[in-house]
Amino acid sequence: MSRPTLAWYGALALLATGSAHALVSSCTVSASGVAFGVYDPTVATATFSSGTVSVSCVVSGATGHNPITIAFDTGSSGTFTSRTMLNATDFLNYNLYLDAAYTQVWGDGTGVSLTYNQFVTPGKPSFSATVYGMMPALQTPGSGTFTDTITVTVSF
């Protein structure tokens, strides 16, 4: 049996934009990993999991709102079409999605991918977003622990 896990690392991009009334001076990002558990290659249904990305910003000003964008990179696969978790030369395909229907690939807005967009205000400077993970059925990897690292970029 394979034990796939997905590690997260947050990267903060300081691309400052905003309205004249509210200003984001900084944001912090944290994320929980998407752990698929033990993968059984004989099961004919996909494996699902989820995680969370949380963003907390320092917003000054009495009114207004600022757009925040969360983007993911491709990880080890180099493509948003299908990400891969690796164990030496073996791999497991998976992907990350914005929606529970698993139709909107979470990425950087290029190719088949979309980004997560949210507004922050002085009254609501923080938010969390669910990351939906799906691993297709009937893959035949070797045994071991499979991992991938996704860089999370928060732009404001």
PLM regions: where:
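Bacterial N-terminal signal peptides that target proteins for export
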Residues: 1-9
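N-terminal signal peptide c-region/cleavage motif recognized by signal peptidases
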Residues: 17-19
